[in-house]
């Protein structure tokens, strides 16, 4: 579903959802779709009309129509939210095409008739007519009209403009076609000197608005197929277990979730961009939404059938109806490739989507924060970290006096001011995880000793969690801690420890009660890395660097005052360490600096078709990531849990960074044959889908925690 921002959009969506849930409406919609399939034989090709009328009665077609034309005076975002829900319910008839017409028709009488559902509209996929400007008539054959049926009006392209023709006139003949997606009427239309009206809206805007509305439909299809697959995977049993407990099925469903979430945010963004006075904002947003939405709807519909198995391949199950709808959307919009190429062309021409979050609630803080940032910016580079720490700007989400206890909105405002002043926030690396854990669970003495020094850059930290044979499976760790006079003796081996050879302190998990259950009996220690008994052996990586290390602990003494929290409660603290994140959003271009750097490298380079398409898909991933970032930030500002969006952002983010590095290597000088910085970056990014939990583990976690699939 298109991500909601306002209460009005939530209410609009719930209105359609509630209507579709009723036995009469829901059953009628599906029955009408199936009746339409038989319409060319013994069925009823007009079975959509009563259901369409019911949807019109909810006010869907009037939601974005001005009040003086009989509408509700709402936004295109409201309209697309309702179209999304209608697509999820597979409401038949010219829903999307009529919705598009309400946005581009200027005649008040016709607009009012469309808003009420008295009239409906189709949209021609291709032109093929000759226009006589002297008589304002058109003649010719239009091969395919989506939503084309007797009694409606039709929008059709001609000579760079869009025309409006009424099928009720004698000069128009409508010939029904058997559509792949038989939930929608499809027709061939012949015009013989038929009266036409040239729309006042530009041809480009009509196409962009059509893409926006159809992207909302695609998002609805992607979500229904995901929900259907997940629901079935929870109850269908094989080999005595629900199939949703099998990793292969979990990963299939988690991938569907990733596609659905990207389709959601892209469709929502296109609807939002429609209100921008700068038409290029809608152009780029609509192209992104159409390309992502078409592919997401198609792929999810196919994977839904895969999860359903044999039942998904039967005529009786509705899954194939959504597969048909997905391909109908793609066919109408000309395929995702068309919009992908448009995304690439617009981006290379310098068009960028402008993204932001409404920070009105903290606008009063801006002068104060801007002044504090200006003081930091005036300092030499080497003194800025201490100043940022002392002012609470380094980690504003931490409690005072170390941070500002900043709300999500204030955090974003601070990021904006730092970016505007070109002040970079230093990276505390593992310190970002260690310090919050100490703040939340440590003693006052621990907090005072470690947190300020960490923020000022005096202490570099490493994380002693992963072990040979256990990796990131913390419950299986074997490093033991044995009681000693005044403290503990730690013995064991850690691996994949970044920066251990440079770190002054380490956060270490060790088993203090070997008889306790796996997740119990673990304690959280702060280890001085200069303590006798610690041996560090660098591990050479595929780049040639040695950032990772093996760390051997041989009766390493850790005093009692270096235990954080309660003994045997380390698992809970480790979860704090791994979960702590601040609210953040890119403050520069929506594509991010890495993509901008790639575009600079490409310059005027001649790319073949395959390279162009790969570039387009990278741009889509960059844009989707930025849109997810904005959505997560908006949810945080509104006091809501980002949930699925946050997990999806991590999954697509690492894939994107890997794909970007590989593409840059292949198009750079040497083409991957000669070792250079691009080759280094490619090799260096291979760890991104492994470090901190592999991609496959993250998919499993997403399937279980977000989709509720059984273990």
Swiss-Prot record:
Catalysed reaction equations from the record: 3-oxochol-4-en-24-oyl-CoA + A = (22E)-3-oxochola-4,22-dien-24-oyl-CoA + AH2; 3beta-hydroxy-chol-5-ene-24-oyl-CoA + A = 3beta-hydroxy-chol-5,22-dien-24-oyl-CoA + AH2
EC number per UniProt: 1.3.99.-
Alphabetized GO MF terms: flavin adenine dinucleotide binding; oxidoreductase activity, acting on the CH-CH group of donors
Cofactor: FAD
InterPro entries: Acyl-CoA_Oxase/DH_mid-dom, Acyl-CoA_Oxase/DH_mid-dom_sf, AcylCo_DH-like_C, AcylCo_DH/oxidase_C, AcylCoA_DH/ox_N, AcylCoA_DH/ox_N_sf, AcylCoA_DH/oxidase_NM_dom_sf, Mycobact_Acyl-CoA_DH
Signal peptide extent: none
Entry GO CC: plasma membrane
The protein's name in its UniProt record: Acyl-CoA dehydrogenase FadE34
Organism (species): Mycobacterium tuberculosis (strain ATCC 25618 / H37Rv)
Name of the gene encoding the protein in the UniProt record: fadE34
